[in-house]
Amino acid sequence: PGFIGTTGLDRYPESAWQGLKNVVRKAPINRHGTAAEISAAVVFLMSEMAAFITGIDLRVDGGIHHGRGGFLFKAKAGSSPPAFNGFHRDETAELLKD
């Protein structure tokens, strides 16, 4: 997945926090993902709705493709679709709380 704003980000040294906050500025979605958005993709793939799927490369990354060195789409200033926060145990990383 792309950069997900869970408490796992807090394990990085504080010297890296600013870079982790800013990494999404160039991404098409303009925000970090949520644990619920990752789990929603997993739930879909495990559901009857995906019964005819035999193989897939499903990128749940907000347009940030690791290892590619760039983005497929250009970010639009001020555009950010609302996050799906359907996972009741999700906690936002401290470094993203402002």
Over which residues does each language-model region extend?
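A glycine/serine/threonine-rich, flexible loop-to-helix segment
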Residues: 3-26, 68-98
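Short, small/polar-rich loop/turn modules that mediate ligand/substrate recognition or access, typified
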Residues: 53-55
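Residue-level recognition of oxygen-bearing side chains
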Residues: 8, 37-40
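Catalytic "switch" loops of ABC-type ATPases
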Residues: 5, 48-49
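Hydrophobic "lid"/C-terminal helical patch
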Residues: 42, 46
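PG/GG-rich flexible active-site loop of Rossmann-like NAD(P)H-dependent oxidoreductases
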Residues: 1-8, 27, 32, 59, ...
